[in-house]
Amino acid sequence: MERDTSPLLFTFALAPERAYPADDTLPDRRFRMYDPARRQPVDWGTLGNLGSAARPLLYETLPRLGFDAGVHAFDLYKLYPDDLRFYRNGRSFSEVYFSQGRTQLDGMLDARFARTFAGGANFSLDYRSINNLGAYRYQRDKHNALSFGIWLPVGSRYDGFVIFSKNVIRQQENGGIVTDTIFGKEQFSGPISAEVRLPAQAALTRLADQTLQLTQHLKFAGGSGEGKRVLRATHTIAWMKADYKFADASLAQDSFFFDTFLTDRRGIRHFLSFNRLDNSFIISTFKAKTRGRPSDVLSVGLRHSFLDLNQEPRDSSFSNLFLTGNMTITPSDGFALVAQGNLGLLSNFGEYRISGELDIGFGKVGRLRAGILSQRYPPSLLFYRLFVSKRLMWQNDFAKSLENSLYATYALPLIGLEMTARTHLINNYLYYNQKGVAVQTASPLQIAQFIISENIGLGPFRFENTVALQQSNRSDVLRLPHWFTKNSLYFSGKLFKKRLQLDAGVDFRMNSEFRPDAYQPVTWQFHLQDSLTQKPYPWIDLFAAFKVQSFRFFVRYENMSTIWNKTEATYQTARYPQPFGAIRFGIAWRFMDSNEKGAGTPPASEPPPNSGTGIGPKGRG
Protein backbone atom coordinates (compact mmCIF):
# COMPACT_ATOMS: atom_id res chain seq x y z
CA MET A 1 0.00 0.00 0.00
CA GLU A 2 1.43 3.40 -0.91
CA ARG A 3 1.90 5.98 1.81
CA ASP A 4 0.94 9.62 1.63
CA THR A 5 4.22 11.51 1.19
CA SER A 6 3.04 15.10 1.77
CA PRO A 7 5.90 16.93 3.57
CA LEU A 8 3.76 18.02 6.52
CA LEU A 9 5.42 18.49 9.92
CA PHE A 10 4.14 19.79 13.24
CA THR A 11 5.52 20.78 16.61
CA PHE A 12 4.28 21.66 20.12
CA ALA A 13 4.59 24.87 22.11
CA LEU A 14 6.69 23.37 24.90
CA ALA A 15 9.34 21.96 22.52
CA PRO A 16 9.43 23.80 19.18
CA GLU A 17 12.91 22.42 18.48
CA ARG A 18 11.44 18.99 17.71
CA ALA A 19 9.24 18.17 14.71
CA TYR A 20 6.93 15.23 14.06
CA PRO A 21 5.43 13.93 10.81
CA ALA A 22 1.67 14.44 10.47
CA ASP A 23 -0.71 11.53 10.03
CA ASP A 24 -1.22 10.30 6.48
CA THR A 25 -4.53 10.32 4.60
CA LEU A 26 -5.00 6.59 4.10
CA PRO A 27 -8.48 5.03 4.62
CA ASP A 28 -7.06 2.90 7.45
CA ARG A 29 -8.39 1.64 10.78
CA ARG A 30 -7.87 4.95 12.55
CA PHE A 31 -9.96 6.71 9.91
CA ARG A 32 -12.90 4.31 9.95
CA MET A 33 -12.84 3.90 13.76
CA TYR A 34 -14.54 7.23 14.44
CA ASP A 35 -15.20 6.59 18.16
CA PRO A 36 -12.28 7.82 20.33
CA ALA A 37 -12.92 4.89 22.69
CA ARG A 38 -12.26 2.43 19.84
CA ARG A 39 -9.24 4.24 18.44
CA GLN A 40 -7.16 3.10 21.41
CA PRO A 41 -4.82 0.08 21.02
CA VAL A 42 -7.30 -1.80 23.24
CA ASP A 43 -10.85 -0.43 23.30
CA TRP A 44 -12.07 1.57 26.28
CA GLY A 45 -15.34 0.71 27.98
CA THR A 46 -18.16 3.26 27.66
CA LEU A 47 -21.82 3.73 28.61
CA GLY A 48 -22.77 2.59 25.11
CA ASN A 49 -23.08 6.03 23.57
CA LEU A 50 -20.60 7.96 21.46
CA GLY A 51 -19.04 10.55 23.76
CA SER A 52 -20.16 8.88 26.99
CA ALA A 53 -18.04 8.35 30.11
CA ALA A 54 -15.19 5.94 29.37
CA ARG A 55 -12.37 4.03 31.06
CA PRO A 56 -9.61 1.65 29.87
CA LEU A 57 -10.47 -2.07 29.72
CA LEU A 58 -6.73 -2.76 29.72
CA TYR A 59 -5.29 -1.19 32.87
CA GLU A 60 -3.31 1.98 32.20
CA THR A 61 -1.12 4.10 34.44
CA LEU A 62 -2.27 7.71 34.67
CA PRO A 63 0.75 10.01 35.16
CA ARG A 64 0.20 12.11 38.29
CA LEU A 65 1.84 15.21 39.66
CA GLY A 66 0.41 17.13 42.61
CA PHE A 67 -3.27 18.12 42.76
CA ASP A 68 -5.79 16.15 40.73
CA ALA A 69 -9.56 16.60 40.92
CA GLY A 70 -10.10 12.93 40.06
CA VAL A 71 -12.56 13.49 37.20
CA HIS A 72 -11.24 11.61 34.16
CA ALA A 73 -14.24 9.81 32.66
CA PHE A 74 -14.38 12.26 29.72
CA ASP A 75 -10.67 12.82 29.06
CA LEU A 76 -10.90 11.21 25.61
CA TYR A 77 -13.00 14.07 24.28
CA LYS A 78 -11.05 17.10 25.56
CA LEU A 79 -8.42 19.41 24.07
CA TYR A 80 -5.71 21.24 26.01
CA PRO A 81 -2.92 23.71 25.07
CA ASP A 82 -0.17 21.09 25.30
CA ASP A 83 -1.97 19.05 22.58
CA LEU A 84 -2.24 21.84 20.00
CA ARG A 85 -0.19 21.15 16.87
CA PHE A 86 1.60 23.96 15.08
CA TYR A 87 2.26 22.93 11.49
CA ARG A 88 5.69 23.88 10.25
CA ASN A 89 5.16 24.65 6.58
CA GLY A 90 4.71 27.56 4.22
CA ARG A 91 1.21 26.58 3.13
CA SER A 92 -2.26 26.85 4.63
CA PHE A 93 -3.44 23.56 6.01
CA SER A 94 -7.01 22.48 6.75
CA GLU A 95 -8.51 19.11 7.58
CA VAL A 96 -12.11 18.17 8.35
CA TYR A 97 -13.54 14.88 9.58
CA PHE A 98 -17.30 14.32 9.87
CA SER A 99 -19.24 11.20 10.82
CA GLN A 100 -22.97 10.57 11.23
CA GLY A 101 -25.07 7.67 12.44
CA ARG A 102 -28.74 6.87 11.98
CA THR A 103 -30.08 10.38 12.61
CA GLN A 104 -28.94 13.99 12.41
CA LEU A 105 -28.59 13.91 16.21
CA ASP A 106 -25.88 11.26 15.99
CA GLY A 107 -22.85 13.06 14.62
CA MET A 108 -19.32 14.19 15.30
CA LEU A 109 -16.99 16.73 13.73
CA ASP A 110 -13.21 17.20 13.96
CA ALA A 111 -11.55 20.16 12.25
CA ARG A 112 -8.01 21.50 12.06
CA PHE A 113 -6.68 24.64 10.44
CA ALA A 114 -3.20 26.17 10.30
CA ARG A 115 -1.66 29.07 8.42
CA THR A 116 1.78 30.66 8.34
CA PHE A 117 1.84 34.43 7.78
CA ALA A 118 4.44 36.93 6.62
CA GLY A 119 7.34 37.12 9.04
CA GLY A 120 6.82 33.58 10.25
CA ALA A 121 3.81 34.01 12.56
CA ASN A 122 1.72 30.84 12.67
CA PHE A 123 -1.93 30.32 13.62
CA SER A 124 -3.36 26.91 14.50
CA LEU A 125 -6.85 25.75 15.50
CA ASP A 126 -8.41 22.44 16.59
CA TYR A 127 -12.15 21.92 17.06
CA ARG A 128 -14.13 18.84 18.09
CA SER A 129 -17.85 18.36 18.47
CA ILE A 130 -19.91 15.33 19.48
CA ASN A 131 -23.71 15.43 19.46
CA ASN A 132 -25.19 11.98 19.99
CA LEU A 133 -28.80 11.48 21.09
CA GLY A 134 -28.29 7.76 21.73
CA ALA A 135 -30.58 4.78 21.20
CA TYR A 136 -32.02 4.67 24.75
CA ARG A 137 -34.02 7.23 26.67
CA TYR A 138 -32.29 10.34 27.96
CA GLN A 139 -28.65 9.48 27.28
CA ARG A 140 -27.60 12.32 25.01
CA ASP A 141 -23.94 13.35 24.94
CA LYS A 142 -23.13 16.79 23.62
CA HIS A 143 -19.52 17.96 23.79
CA ASN A 144 -17.56 20.85 22.33
CA ALA A 145 -13.79 21.25 22.50
CA LEU A 146 -11.80 24.14 21.07
CA SER A 147 -8.10 24.98 21.10
CA PHE A 148 -6.37 27.70 19.12
CA GLY A 149 -3.12 29.58 19.35
CA ILE A 150 -0.52 31.83 17.75
CA TRP A 151 3.17 31.07 17.38
CA LEU A 152 5.18 34.29 17.07
CA PRO A 153 8.94 34.00 16.41
CA VAL A 154 11.07 37.15 16.72
CA GLY A 155 14.42 36.87 15.03
CA SER A 156 16.31 33.66 15.63
CA ARG A 157 16.28 33.75 19.45
CA TYR A 158 12.68 34.21 20.61
CA ASP A 159 9.57 32.08 20.19
CA GLY A 160 6.27 32.98 21.85
CA PHE A 161 3.11 30.84 21.97
CA VAL A 162 -0.29 32.06 23.15
CA ILE A 163 -2.91 29.29 23.34
CA PHE A 164 -6.52 29.18 24.52
CA SER A 165 -8.59 26.04 25.02
CA LYS A 166 -12.14 25.38 26.16
CA ASN A 167 -14.03 22.14 26.81
CA VAL A 168 -17.74 21.75 27.56
CA ILE A 169 -19.00 18.25 28.37
CA ARG A 170 -22.76 17.60 28.72
CA GLN A 171 -24.26 14.20 29.42
CA GLN A 172 -27.85 13.28 30.20
CA GLU A 173 -27.85 10.66 32.96
CA ASN A 174 -30.42 7.85 32.70
CA GLY A 175 -28.76 5.49 35.20
CA GLY A 176 -28.80 2.62 32.72
CA ILE A 177 -31.71 0.32 31.88
CA VAL A 178 -33.82 -1.55 34.44
CA THR A 179 -33.78 -4.89 32.60
CA ASP A 180 -32.87 -6.37 29.22
CA THR A 181 -35.25 -9.33 29.46
CA ILE A 182 -37.70 -7.59 27.13
CA PHE A 183 -35.22 -7.50 24.23
CA GLY A 184 -36.51 -9.42 21.23
CA LYS A 185 -40.05 -9.87 22.57
CA GLU A 186 -43.16 -8.80 20.70
CA GLN A 187 -43.84 -5.84 22.99
CA PHE A 188 -40.28 -4.55 22.51
CA SER A 189 -40.37 -1.77 19.92
CA GLY A 190 -36.69 -0.86 20.20
CA PRO A 191 -34.20 0.53 22.73
CA ILE A 192 -36.32 3.65 23.25
CA SER A 193 -38.98 1.48 24.92
CA ALA A 194 -36.57 0.12 27.56
CA GLU A 195 -37.27 1.46 31.05
CA VAL A 196 -34.38 3.44 32.57
CA ARG A 197 -33.30 3.69 36.22
CA LEU A 198 -33.63 7.49 36.36
CA PRO A 199 -37.13 7.79 34.83
CA ALA A 200 -37.66 11.46 35.71
CA GLN A 201 -35.15 12.30 32.95
CA ALA A 202 -33.82 15.31 34.82
CA ALA A 203 -30.32 14.26 35.91
CA LEU A 204 -27.56 16.10 34.06
CA THR A 205 -23.76 16.32 34.10
CA ARG A 206 -21.95 19.43 32.89
CA LEU A 207 -18.16 19.69 33.02
CA ALA A 208 -16.47 22.81 31.68
CA ASP A 209 -12.94 24.15 31.70
CA GLN A 210 -10.97 26.83 29.93
CA THR A 211 -7.24 27.47 29.83
CA LEU A 212 -5.13 30.42 28.69
CA GLN A 213 -1.44 29.64 28.32
CA LEU A 214 1.60 31.74 27.40
CA THR A 215 4.89 29.98 26.63
CA GLN A 216 8.05 31.95 25.85
CA HIS A 217 11.44 30.63 24.72
CA LEU A 218 14.56 32.83 24.69
CA LYS A 219 17.89 31.55 23.37
CA PHE A 220 20.89 33.04 25.20
CA ALA A 221 23.52 31.23 23.17
CA GLY A 222 23.58 29.40 19.87
CA GLY A 223 21.23 29.93 16.97
CA SER A 224 18.92 28.15 14.61
CA GLY A 225 21.68 26.62 12.50
CA GLU A 226 22.42 22.93 12.42
CA GLY A 227 25.11 21.56 14.71
CA LYS A 228 25.14 24.54 17.10
CA ARG A 229 24.57 24.12 20.84
CA VAL A 230 21.73 26.21 22.17
CA LEU A 231 21.20 27.54 25.70
CA ARG A 232 17.57 28.50 26.22
CA ALA A 233 15.28 29.77 28.97
CA THR A 234 11.59 28.84 28.87
CA HIS A 235 8.79 30.33 30.93
CA THR A 236 5.21 29.06 30.83
CA ILE A 237 2.28 30.59 32.66
CA ALA A 238 -1.17 29.04 32.40
CA TRP A 239 -4.48 29.96 34.00
CA MET A 240 -7.22 27.34 34.13
CA LYS A 241 -10.80 27.64 35.37
CA ALA A 242 -12.87 24.48 35.79
CA ASP A 243 -16.50 23.95 36.84
CA TYR A 244 -17.92 20.43 37.38
CA LYS A 245 -21.59 19.92 38.18
CA PHE A 246 -24.10 17.11 38.53
CA ALA A 247 -27.71 17.86 39.44
CA ASP A 248 -31.03 16.04 39.65
CA ALA A 249 -33.88 18.24 40.87
CA SER A 250 -36.62 15.64 40.40
CA LEU A 251 -36.28 12.87 42.99
CA ALA A 252 -39.90 11.74 43.15
CA GLN A 253 -39.03 8.84 40.83
CA ASP A 254 -35.21 8.88 41.02
CA SER A 255 -34.56 8.64 44.77
CA PHE A 256 -34.06 4.84 44.85
CA PHE A 257 -31.16 5.00 42.40
CA PHE A 258 -28.94 7.27 44.50
CA ASP A 259 -28.97 5.15 47.67
CA THR A 260 -25.81 6.20 49.56
CA PHE A 261 -25.79 9.66 47.99
CA LEU A 262 -29.40 10.57 48.77
CA THR A 263 -28.64 13.42 51.19
CA ASP A 264 -31.62 15.64 50.39
CA ARG A 265 -34.95 14.47 48.97
CA ARG A 266 -35.60 17.87 47.44
CA GLY A 267 -32.78 17.29 44.95
CA ILE A 268 -29.17 16.23 44.55
CA ARG A 269 -26.32 18.50 43.54
CA HIS A 270 -22.58 17.95 43.36
CA PHE A 271 -20.56 21.00 42.42
CA LEU A 272 -16.87 21.79 42.51
CA SER A 273 -14.78 24.41 40.79
CA PHE A 274 -11.23 25.64 40.90
CA ASN A 275 -8.96 28.28 39.49
CA ARG A 276 -5.42 27.13 38.81
CA LEU A 277 -2.36 29.22 38.02
CA ASP A 278 0.70 27.30 36.82
CA ASN A 279 4.15 28.82 36.48
CA SER A 280 7.19 26.94 35.22
CA PHE A 281 10.71 28.13 34.50
CA ILE A 282 13.15 25.87 32.64
CA ILE A 283 16.78 26.22 31.55
CA SER A 284 17.67 23.84 28.74
CA THR A 285 20.49 23.13 26.35
CA PHE A 286 20.35 21.12 23.14
CA LYS A 287 22.11 20.60 19.84
CA ALA A 288 20.50 19.61 16.55
CA LYS A 289 22.53 17.82 13.90
CA THR A 290 19.38 17.96 11.78
CA ARG A 291 16.89 20.80 12.23
CA GLY A 292 13.69 19.54 13.79
CA ARG A 293 15.45 16.65 15.54
CA PRO A 294 17.83 17.60 18.38
CA SER A 295 20.45 14.98 19.13
CA ASP A 296 20.45 15.75 22.85
CA VAL A 297 18.43 17.81 25.32
CA LEU A 298 19.20 18.56 28.96
CA SER A 299 16.90 20.73 31.08
CA VAL A 300 16.20 21.63 34.72
CA GLY A 301 13.48 23.81 36.15
CA LEU A 302 10.84 24.62 38.75
CA ARG A 303 7.08 24.24 38.45
CA HIS A 304 4.69 26.01 40.82
CA SER A 305 0.90 25.72 40.90
CA PHE A 306 -1.50 27.84 42.94
CA LEU A 307 -5.03 26.49 43.34
CA ASP A 308 -8.15 28.21 44.61
CA LEU A 309 -10.67 25.43 45.22
CA ASN A 310 -14.41 25.66 45.82
CA GLN A 311 -15.81 22.27 46.77
CA GLU A 312 -19.33 23.33 47.61
CA PRO A 313 -19.71 24.48 50.37
CA ARG A 314 -16.02 24.60 51.40
CA ASP A 315 -13.33 26.91 49.99
CA SER A 316 -9.58 26.37 50.23
CA SER A 317 -6.34 27.44 48.56
CA PHE A 318 -2.93 25.78 48.40
CA SER A 319 0.20 25.40 46.28
CA ASN A 320 2.22 22.66 44.61
CA LEU A 321 5.96 22.98 43.96
CA PHE A 322 8.12 20.56 41.98
CA LEU A 323 11.71 20.46 40.77
CA THR A 324 11.76 19.16 37.18
CA GLY A 325 14.42 17.66 34.94
CA ASN A 326 14.68 16.12 31.50
CA MET A 327 17.40 14.35 29.54
CA THR A 328 16.96 13.23 25.93
CA ILE A 329 19.64 11.59 23.78
CA THR A 330 18.72 10.85 20.14
CA PRO A 331 21.93 10.77 18.08
CA SER A 332 20.30 8.81 15.24
CA ASP A 333 17.12 7.10 14.08
CA GLY A 334 18.42 3.91 15.68
CA PHE A 335 18.76 5.15 19.26
CA ALA A 336 16.73 7.28 21.66
CA LEU A 337 16.96 7.66 25.42
CA VAL A 338 14.48 9.86 27.29
CA ALA A 339 14.50 10.38 31.07
CA GLN A 340 12.27 12.73 33.04
CA GLY A 341 12.06 13.49 36.74
CA ASN A 342 9.80 15.54 39.02
CA LEU A 343 10.54 15.91 42.73
CA GLY A 344 8.09 17.47 45.18
CA LEU A 345 9.23 20.30 47.45
CA LEU A 346 7.79 21.92 50.61
CA SER A 347 4.20 20.64 51.08
CA ASN A 348 4.77 18.15 48.24
CA PHE A 349 7.82 16.61 49.92
CA GLY A 350 7.86 12.84 49.39
CA GLU A 351 5.99 13.02 46.09
CA TYR A 352 7.74 12.31 42.81
CA ARG A 353 7.39 11.08 39.25
CA ILE A 354 10.30 9.50 37.39
CA SER A 355 10.08 8.01 33.91
CA GLY A 356 12.49 6.68 31.33
CA GLU A 357 12.25 5.24 27.83
CA LEU A 358 14.87 3.53 25.68
CA ASP A 359 14.41 2.89 21.95
CA ILE A 360 16.99 0.91 19.95
CA GLY A 361 16.73 0.02 16.28
CA PHE A 362 18.45 -3.05 14.85
CA GLY A 363 17.71 -2.47 11.18
CA LYS A 364 15.95 -5.39 9.54
CA VAL A 365 16.20 -7.39 12.79
CA GLY A 366 13.61 -5.13 14.43
CA ARG A 367 13.28 -2.51 17.13
CA LEU A 368 13.30 -2.70 20.93
CA ARG A 369 11.62 -0.23 23.27
CA ALA A 370 11.62 -0.35 27.05
CA GLY A 371 10.28 2.04 29.64
CA ILE A 372 9.71 2.59 33.32
CA LEU A 373 7.46 4.89 35.35
CA SER A 374 7.62 5.31 39.10
CA GLN A 375 5.45 7.79 40.97
CA ARG A 376 4.23 8.60 44.47
CA TYR A 377 1.23 10.87 44.65
CA PRO A 378 -1.58 11.97 47.01
CA PRO A 379 -5.19 10.82 46.63
CA SER A 380 -7.20 12.83 44.12
CA LEU A 381 -9.71 15.29 45.53
CA LEU A 382 -12.77 13.02 45.21
CA PHE A 383 -11.00 10.13 46.94
CA TYR A 384 -10.06 12.49 49.74
CA ARG A 385 -13.31 14.40 50.23
CA LEU A 386 -16.83 14.54 48.81
CA PHE A 387 -19.79 16.82 49.42
CA VAL A 388 -23.25 16.11 47.98
CA SER A 389 -25.90 18.81 48.31
CA LYS A 390 -23.47 20.64 50.65
CA ARG A 391 -23.34 17.66 53.03
CA LEU A 392 -20.09 15.88 53.77
CA MET A 393 -20.14 12.29 52.48
CA TRP A 394 -16.57 11.38 53.41
CA GLN A 395 -13.24 12.90 54.34
CA ASN A 396 -10.51 10.29 54.27
CA ASP A 397 -6.97 10.13 55.55
CA PHE A 398 -5.65 7.84 52.82
CA ALA A 399 -1.94 7.17 52.40
CA LYS A 400 -0.16 8.34 49.27
CA SER A 401 -0.13 5.76 46.48
CA LEU A 402 3.13 4.34 45.14
CA GLU A 403 2.96 3.05 41.57
CA ASN A 404 5.64 1.39 39.45
CA SER A 405 5.16 0.38 35.81
CA LEU A 406 7.63 -1.38 33.54
CA TYR A 407 7.29 -2.39 29.90
CA ALA A 408 9.30 -3.80 27.00
CA THR A 409 8.26 -3.88 23.33
CA TYR A 410 9.85 -5.72 20.44
CA ALA A 411 8.76 -4.83 16.91
CA LEU A 412 9.67 -6.49 13.63
CA PRO A 413 8.10 -4.29 10.92
CA LEU A 414 9.30 -6.65 8.18
CA ILE A 415 6.53 -9.12 9.13
CA GLY A 416 4.19 -6.64 10.87
CA LEU A 417 4.86 -8.04 14.36
CA GLU A 418 4.89 -6.18 17.67
CA MET A 419 4.96 -7.72 21.16
CA THR A 420 4.70 -5.87 24.48
CA ALA A 421 5.07 -7.14 28.04
CA ARG A 422 4.02 -4.77 30.82
CA THR A 423 3.70 -4.98 34.59
CA HIS A 424 2.18 -2.62 37.16
CA LEU A 425 2.66 -2.65 40.93
CA ILE A 426 0.53 -0.30 43.04
CA ASN A 427 0.78 0.12 46.79
CA ASN A 428 -2.14 1.82 48.56
CA TYR A 429 -4.39 1.37 45.51
CA LEU A 430 -7.56 3.49 45.54
CA TYR A 431 -10.92 2.50 44.07
CA TYR A 432 -14.68 2.87 44.54
CA ASN A 433 -16.53 -0.08 46.08
CA GLN A 434 -19.95 -1.56 45.32
CA LYS A 435 -21.70 1.42 46.96
CA GLY A 436 -19.59 3.91 45.03
CA VAL A 437 -17.63 4.85 48.17
CA ALA A 438 -13.89 5.58 48.10
CA VAL A 439 -11.73 2.76 49.54
CA GLN A 440 -8.00 2.05 49.80
CA THR A 441 -6.41 -1.42 49.72
CA ALA A 442 -4.02 -2.55 52.43
CA SER A 443 -2.10 -5.01 50.23
CA PRO A 444 -0.36 -4.31 46.89
CA LEU A 445 -2.13 -4.68 43.55
CA GLN A 446 -0.09 -6.28 40.77
CA ILE A 447 -1.10 -6.50 37.11
CA ALA A 448 0.74 -8.37 34.36
CA GLN A 449 -0.08 -7.70 30.69
CA PHE A 450 1.01 -9.06 27.33
CA ILE A 451 -0.04 -7.54 24.00
CA ILE A 452 0.77 -8.88 20.56
CA SER A 453 -0.07 -7.30 17.21
CA GLU A 454 0.43 -9.03 13.87
CA ASN A 455 -0.44 -7.46 10.52
CA ILE A 456 -0.34 -9.92 7.63
CA GLY A 457 -0.60 -9.11 3.94
CA LEU A 458 -1.42 -11.76 1.32
CA GLY A 459 -1.65 -10.05 -2.03
CA PRO A 460 -4.53 -7.56 -1.83
CA PHE A 461 -5.82 -9.00 1.46
CA ARG A 462 -4.93 -7.68 4.92
CA PHE A 463 -5.31 -9.48 8.23
CA GLU A 464 -4.66 -7.17 11.22
CA ASN A 465 -4.74 -8.62 14.72
CA THR A 466 -4.27 -7.34 18.26
CA VAL A 467 -4.57 -9.67 21.24
CA ALA A 468 -4.13 -8.49 24.84
CA LEU A 469 -3.85 -10.61 27.99
CA GLN A 470 -3.92 -9.31 31.55
CA GLN A 471 -4.00 -10.85 35.01
CA SER A 472 -4.09 -9.26 38.45
CA ASN A 473 -3.64 -10.64 41.95
CA ARG A 474 -6.69 -8.75 43.29
CA SER A 475 -9.84 -9.58 41.32
CA ASP A 476 -11.80 -8.29 44.31
CA VAL A 477 -10.75 -4.69 43.61
CA LEU A 478 -9.91 -4.67 39.89
CA ARG A 479 -12.33 -6.31 37.46
CA LEU A 480 -11.23 -6.12 33.86
CA PRO A 481 -11.27 -8.69 31.02
CA HIS A 482 -8.46 -11.28 31.16
CA TRP A 483 -8.16 -11.19 27.38
CA PHE A 484 -9.23 -8.95 24.54
CA THR A 485 -8.96 -9.41 20.79
CA LYS A 486 -9.60 -7.03 17.90
CA ASN A 487 -9.14 -8.18 14.32
CA SER A 488 -9.65 -6.84 10.82
CA LEU A 489 -9.86 -8.87 7.62
CA TYR A 490 -10.24 -6.83 4.46
CA PHE A 491 -9.40 -6.30 0.81
CA SER A 492 -7.08 -3.38 0.07
CA GLY A 493 -6.35 -2.28 -3.47
CA LYS A 494 -6.62 0.41 -6.12
CA LEU A 495 -9.42 0.63 -8.66
CA PHE A 496 -10.40 2.79 -11.64
CA LYS A 497 -6.91 3.15 -13.10
CA LYS A 498 -5.45 3.31 -9.59
CA ARG A 499 -7.27 6.54 -8.79
CA LEU A 500 -9.39 5.10 -5.99
CA GLN A 501 -8.00 3.33 -2.92
CA LEU A 502 -10.48 0.81 -1.49
CA ASP A 503 -10.41 -1.02 1.86
CA ALA A 504 -13.42 -3.31 2.41
CA GLY A 505 -13.98 -6.09 4.92
CA VAL A 506 -14.88 -6.77 8.55
CA ASP A 507 -13.73 -5.55 11.97
CA PHE A 508 -14.14 -7.95 14.88
CA ARG A 509 -13.67 -7.63 18.63
CA MET A 510 -14.32 -9.79 21.66
CA ASN A 511 -13.21 -10.00 25.28
CA SER A 512 -13.33 -12.56 28.05
CA GLU A 513 -16.06 -12.91 30.63
CA PHE A 514 -15.84 -10.25 33.35
CA ARG A 515 -17.89 -8.15 35.73
CA PRO A 516 -18.02 -4.66 34.21
CA ASP A 517 -17.93 -1.73 36.59
CA ALA A 518 -21.05 0.29 37.29
CA TYR A 519 -21.17 4.07 36.85
CA GLN A 520 -22.19 6.64 39.46
CA PRO A 521 -23.10 9.96 37.78
CA VAL A 522 -23.08 11.90 41.09
CA THR A 523 -19.29 11.50 41.35
CA TRP A 524 -18.54 10.78 37.66
CA GLN A 525 -16.81 7.56 38.73
CA PHE A 526 -16.84 3.90 37.74
CA HIS A 527 -17.19 1.53 40.68
CA LEU A 528 -17.44 -2.18 41.48
CA GLN A 529 -20.71 -4.10 41.21
CA ASP A 530 -21.71 -7.74 41.79
CA SER A 531 -25.03 -8.10 39.96
CA LEU A 532 -24.01 -8.44 36.29
CA THR A 533 -21.47 -10.61 34.47
CA GLN A 534 -20.72 -10.06 30.79
CA LYS A 535 -19.90 -13.18 28.79
CA PRO A 536 -17.85 -13.13 25.55
CA TYR A 537 -19.80 -11.40 22.80
CA PRO A 538 -18.76 -11.37 19.10
CA TRP A 539 -18.92 -7.77 17.90
CA ILE A 540 -18.73 -7.65 14.09
CA ASP A 541 -18.65 -4.55 11.86
CA LEU A 542 -18.87 -4.63 8.07
CA PHE A 543 -17.09 -1.69 6.39
CA ALA A 544 -15.91 -0.12 3.17
CA ALA A 545 -13.50 2.84 3.07
CA PHE A 546 -12.40 4.83 0.03
CA LYS A 547 -9.77 7.42 -0.81
CA VAL A 548 -9.46 9.66 -3.88
CA GLN A 549 -6.49 12.01 -3.56
CA SER A 550 -6.98 13.62 -0.11
CA PHE A 551 -10.73 12.88 0.12
CA ARG A 552 -11.81 9.87 2.20
CA PHE A 553 -15.16 8.23 2.83
CA PHE A 554 -16.32 5.23 4.86
CA VAL A 555 -19.58 3.40 5.47
CA ARG A 556 -19.99 0.67 8.06
CA TYR A 557 -22.70 -1.49 9.59
CA GLU A 558 -21.90 -1.97 13.27
CA ASN A 559 -22.75 -4.87 15.58
CA MET A 560 -23.97 -7.28 12.92
CA SER A 561 -24.61 -9.93 15.59
CA THR A 562 -27.92 -8.24 16.38
CA ILE A 563 -29.21 -9.19 12.92
CA TRP A 564 -29.55 -12.83 14.01
CA ASN A 565 -29.55 -12.37 17.79
CA LYS A 566 -32.06 -9.75 18.93
CA THR A 567 -32.38 -10.90 22.55
CA GLU A 568 -28.82 -10.51 23.79
CA ALA A 569 -27.15 -7.23 24.71
CA THR A 570 -23.49 -6.66 25.53
CA TYR A 571 -22.18 -4.45 28.32
CA GLN A 572 -18.90 -2.64 28.90
CA THR A 573 -20.49 -0.88 31.87
CA ALA A 574 -23.14 -2.55 34.03
CA ARG A 575 -26.73 -1.71 32.98
CA TYR A 576 -25.55 0.40 30.03
CA PRO A 577 -25.97 -1.82 26.93
CA GLN A 578 -23.98 -1.21 23.79
CA PRO A 579 -26.12 -0.12 20.81
CA PHE A 580 -27.90 -2.49 18.46
CA GLY A 581 -26.86 -2.79 14.81
CA ALA A 582 -26.82 0.42 12.77
CA ILE A 583 -25.27 2.07 9.73
CA ARG A 584 -22.72 4.85 10.04
CA PHE A 585 -20.76 6.86 7.49
CA GLY A 586 -17.92 9.34 7.61
CA ILE A 587 -15.98 11.67 5.33
CA ALA A 588 -12.66 13.50 5.63
CA TRP A 589 -10.65 15.78 3.43
CA ARG A 590 -7.38 17.69 3.66
CA PHE A 591 -6.39 20.87 1.80
CA MET A 592 -2.88 22.27 1.37
CA ASP A 593 -2.89 25.69 -0.29
CA SER A 594 0.01 28.02 -0.98
CA ASN A 595 -0.14 31.21 1.05
CA GLU A 596 -0.03 34.63 -0.53
CA LYS A 597 3.30 35.84 -1.85
CA GLY A 598 5.54 36.84 1.02
CA ALA A 599 3.47 34.96 3.58
CA GLY A 600 5.25 31.67 3.35
CA THR A 601 8.27 32.45 5.52
CA PRO A 602 8.38 29.70 8.11
CA PRO A 603 9.24 30.21 11.78
CA ALA A 604 12.95 30.51 12.57
CA SER A 605 13.14 27.00 13.97
CA GLU A 606 11.48 25.47 10.91
CA PRO A 607 12.92 22.03 10.09
CA PRO A 608 13.67 21.05 6.51
CA PRO A 609 11.35 18.61 4.71
CA ASN A 610 11.54 14.95 5.70
CA SER A 611 13.05 15.67 9.12
CA GLY A 612 11.44 14.59 12.35
CA THR A 613 10.81 11.29 14.02
CA GLY A 614 7.81 9.26 15.02
CA ILE A 615 9.12 9.06 18.59
CA GLY A 616 7.35 11.51 20.87
CA PRO A 617 3.93 12.93 21.73
CA LYS A 618 0.99 12.41 19.45
CA GLY A 619 -2.55 13.72 19.32
CA ARG A 620 -5.17 12.00 21.44
CA GLY A 621 -8.15 11.66 19.25
Where in the sequence are the language-model features?
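Transmembrane beta-barrel wall of Gram-negative outer-membrane proteins
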Residues: 107-129, 138-170
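Short strand-turn segments of transmembrane beta-barrel domains in outer membranes
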Residues: 67-69, 81-86, 90-112, 134
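Short acidic, glycine/serine/threonine-rich loops at helix termini
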Residues: 136-137, 173-176, 380-385
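Acidic, small-polar-rich N-terminal luminal/periplasmic segments of exported/outer-membrane proteins
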Residues: 2-90
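N-terminal low-complexity tails
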Residues: 257-262
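An acidic- and aromatic-residue-enriched active-site/binding cleft used to recognize and process polar
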Residues: 101, 118, 126-132, 155, ...
